[in-house]
Amino acid sequence: MEWKGRVLVQLLMLVCVLEVSLCQHWSYGWLPGGKRSVGEVEATIRMMDGGDTLLSIPADTPMEQLSPIHIMNEVDAEGFPLKEQRFPNRRGRM
C-alpha cells in the first residue's frame, strides 16, 4: 500500500512539473520567444504621451528642498563647547 501511494505522489509531481515546463505563456502583443511587434510598442508609447496628463511634475526635486548640510572641521569648531569633550587627550597636531 505504501508503494502505491509513493508512485501516485511521484506521478502527480511529474504531471505538475510537465505542465509548468511545457506550457508557454502568451501575453497580449507578445510573439513566441518573448518578442513584440514594433507597431504595438509604438502605439503604446503614443498612448502614454497623450499631452493632457493630470499629474504635474514638481519644480524642485526633494534633494533641492532639503536644507544644505554644513560640514564643520576643527578650525570652525574653536568656540564649539563639545570640542573639548570629544577630544579630551588631544595635545595638538603633529
UniProtKB/Swiss-Prot annotation:
Protein family according to the UniProt entry: Belongs to the GnRH family.
Keyword terms: Amidation, Cleavage on pair of basic residues, Hormone, Pyrrolidone carboxylic acid, Secreted, Signal
Species for this entry: Rutilus rutilus
GO molecular function: gonadotropin hormone-releasing hormone activity; gonadotropin-releasing hormone receptor binding
Record GO cellular component, one term: extracellular space
Gene name in the database record: gnrh3
The UniProt record lists the keyword Signal: yes
Residues with Glycine amide modification: G33
Name by which UniProt lists this protein: Progonadoliberin-3
